[in-house]
UniProtKB/Swiss-Prot annotation:
InterPro entries noted in UniProt: PSP1-like, PSP1_C
Organism for this UniProt entry: Treponema pallidum (strain Nichols)
Protein name per its UniProtKB record: Protein tpl
PANTHER family per the UniProt record, alphabetical: PROTEIN PSP1
Gene that encodes it: tpl
GO CC annotations, alphabetized: cytoplasm
């Protein structure tokens, strides 16, 4: 909007005093769509909320394991082709206190889990442990080259923790997203810094870009084709 100038006003001074981009109000009425990220797995969720949220605000949102803590990544202004949840509430001090207590418990649980894997000589690797905010259970994410019979392990862990134990196998790309790291380009891995969701990558993408297919150069830290091959799709 062009500011109105008084007859005796200096045009340069008047324009300089008018901000080009006026500050946006912190609170708006209506319902807005936000992109959220789960802290333990870096998975992305989409949820609606009735008020404006700052980036990095912690909220409570429904997940596969019940209500849990997620961080606001930003507001979404275009439609998304995925399931959309509803934010339960902005995380309270009590929610954040419980979340921090759970994170301390997770570190100890991971050590016990790794010790039990070694005891039972199972070919699997512990990636992370998670205590949901409002659920009486503990979830272990692991990777393995093949299917693992861990029934005895689950019984042992259940007796140790005195609660419901759930083991969930994840693939190599999901593992890389959780663990993170720096790739050969010197930047953080795309799967945990650029993409909100893991996109499929195929050999066809390499051929379409007229790139030489050298396995050592085209493979990422996860052992699969690099996510950056999808940038020009």
């Amino acid at each position: 909007m062009i500011p109105k100038l008084s007859p005796n006003a200096d045009p340069c001074t008047a324009c300089a005093s008018t901000p080009a981009f006026p500050p946006q109000p912190m609170e708006e009425e209506g319902e807005f769509l936000y992109q959220l990220r789960l802290e333990y797995s870096r998975e992305v969720l989409y949820a609606r909320f009735h008020a404006a949220l700052r980036v990095h605000t912690f909220v409570v949102v429904p997940t596969r394991y019940g209500n849990d803590i997620a961080r606001c990544v930003g507001r979404i202004r275009t439609p998304v082709q995925t399931d959309i949840a509803s934010v339960v509430r902005v995380a309270s001090d009590q929610d954040l206190c419980t979340w921090h207590i759970h994170r301390e418990k997770e570190r100890a649980a991971e050590m016990i889990f790794r010790d039990r894997i070694e005891h039972y000589q199972l070919e699997m690797k512990c990636i992370c442990c998670h205590y949901p905010l409002e659920e009486a259970r503990v979830v272990f994410l692991y990777s393995a080259p093949a299917r693992v019979d861990f029934r005895e392990l689950v019984r042992d862990l259940g007796a140790t923790f005195g609660t419901r134990v759930e083991l969930r196998q994840i693939n190599e790309r999901e593992e890389a997203r959780i663990v993170g790291g720096i790739d050969c380009c010197g930047r953080a891995l795309c799967c945990c810094s650029v993409f909100s969701r893991l996109r499929p990558v195929s050999v066809k993408m390499v051929k379409e870009k007229n790139l030489l297919f050298r396995s050592t150069q085209m493979m990422g830290r996860c052992g699969r084709l690099r996510c950056c091959l999808t940038f020009e799709e």
